[in-house]
């Protein structure tokens, strides 16, 4: 029996989820088994959104290639997005700490789902790799892609999950699922003093 997972990637106007906005979302569903084998990649959900608070900063356009003209009048189909998320057993993101905050702040239905991070929850360094950046991992796994657009990042992430790790030879997605199944706790530091933000960030 297979389950449905979904790989998420966002492009945003900045790094702070309290002030920046989502300008592109990609969610690529895939079918997988409980031991981490991915059998099928399904039709992607990929949409742009015009920010409500002004224009896309120039430096963000340089990184993502997304212009104000491209997002003009665009809006995310929340009902369709919710449908995909509700059917998914797990949401995977590369650097989920970033994507999850934005996703849950804008769409509350993400908060009820289990999440997994393909960057922090796989021991890449133990597997002989120097870091967890997606482009680097893709290159080391033998494939290249056009980074910094949401849908291509998702496809690259899914491709990475289908590979065996270099040192242990374990299936990457199986390792991630085992890690994601461990019990975790989330702590919110709401209305913490501004001068404590760096300390809190360091502590995760």
Q: What does each of the following model-derived ranges do?
A:
Residues 119, 125-130, 140, 161-167:
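Extended, compositionally biased eukaryotic interaction scaffolds
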Residues 1, 163-203:
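Acidic two-metal-ion nuclease catalytic site recognized across multiple nuclease folds
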């Amino acid at each position: 029996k297979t389950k449905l997972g979904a790989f998420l990637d966002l492009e945003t106007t900045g790094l702070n989820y309290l002030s920046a906005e989502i300008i592109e979302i990609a969610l690529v569903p895939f079918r997988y088994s409980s031991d981490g084998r991915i059998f099928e990649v399904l039709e992607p959900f990929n949409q742009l959104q015009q920010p409500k608070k002004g224009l896309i900063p120039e430096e963000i356009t340089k990184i993502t290639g997304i212009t104000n003209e491209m997002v003009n009048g665009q809006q995310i189909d929340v009902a369709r997005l919710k449908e995909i998320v509700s059917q998914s057993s797990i949401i995977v993101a590369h650097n989920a700490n970033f994507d999850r905050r934005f996703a849950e702040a804008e769409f509350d239905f993400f908060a009820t789902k289990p999440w997994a991070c393909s960057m922090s929850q796989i021991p890449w360094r133990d597997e002989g790799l120097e870091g967890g950046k997606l482009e680097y991992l893709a290159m080391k796994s033998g494939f290249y892609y056009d980074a910094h657009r949401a849908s291509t990042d998702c496809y690259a992430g899914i491709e990475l999950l289908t590979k065996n790790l270099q040192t242990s030879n374990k299936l990457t997605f199986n390792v991630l699922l085992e890690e994601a199944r461990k019990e975790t706790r989330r702590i919110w530091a709401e209305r913490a003093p501004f001068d404590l933000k760096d300390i809190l960030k360091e502590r995760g």
